[in-house]
């Protein structure tokens, strides 16, 4: 039986400009939920990991496509060593690696992990600042962090998924991330 917290109202509409249906979680979008790194986030691991200050960075970033990868490749050349705790490792060994194949078996790309979290995550105590090195560097450059970061990193806590049926019709669903969405670690 569903718990009250799992019951949501949804809004759906057809996009007249393309063969697409939008499903939007109205309950979540109207909620007062906040997801701000460093403000008590319990993280996405199996148990409360607030003290680790990893937030949703425990598994690295999973890129949505090559454009997403290229955004970070272009941004990285502007990140200074004093802004990124693992800059030397990223320069020497790279910051990307192959991920698990997607649902259709196609290859994916993810950020490398260092010490069980994203290579771009500056850990507590780093002189350049705790949190995402891409975010820190973008702010220092006077630019928007969303222009430097992987899509998933600036979209969280909102999840956008697209499914295409056999006729080519796309259903796009806009909703909250749930712990189960993070896979084995977030259940």
What do the predicted segments below correspond to?
Residues 1-187:
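Short loop/turn segments that flank or connect secondary-structure elements
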């Amino acid at each position: 039986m569903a718990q009250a917290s799992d019951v949501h109202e949804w809004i759906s509409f057809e996009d007249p400009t393309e063969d697409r249906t939008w499903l939007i979680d109205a309950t979540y979008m109207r909620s007062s939920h906040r997801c701000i790194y460093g403000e008590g986030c319990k993280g996405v691991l199996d148990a409360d990991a607030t003290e680790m200050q990893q937030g949703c960075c425990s598994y690295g970033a999973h890129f949505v496509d090559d454009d997403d990868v290229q955004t970070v490749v272009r941004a990285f050349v502007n990140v200074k060593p004093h802004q990124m705790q693992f800059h030397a490792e990223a320069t020497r060994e790279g910051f990307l690696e192959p991920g698990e194949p997607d649902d259709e078996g196609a290859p994916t790309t993810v950020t490398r992990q260092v010490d069980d979290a994203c290579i771009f995550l500056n850990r507590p105590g780093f002189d350049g600042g705790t949190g995402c090195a891409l975010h820190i560097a973008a702010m220092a450059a006077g630019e928007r962090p969303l222009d430097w970061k992987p899509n998933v990193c600036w979209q969280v806590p909102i999840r956008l998924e697209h499914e295409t049926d056999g006729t080519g019709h796309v259903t796009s669903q806009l909703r909250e991330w749930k712990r189960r969405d993070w896979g084995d670690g977030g259940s």
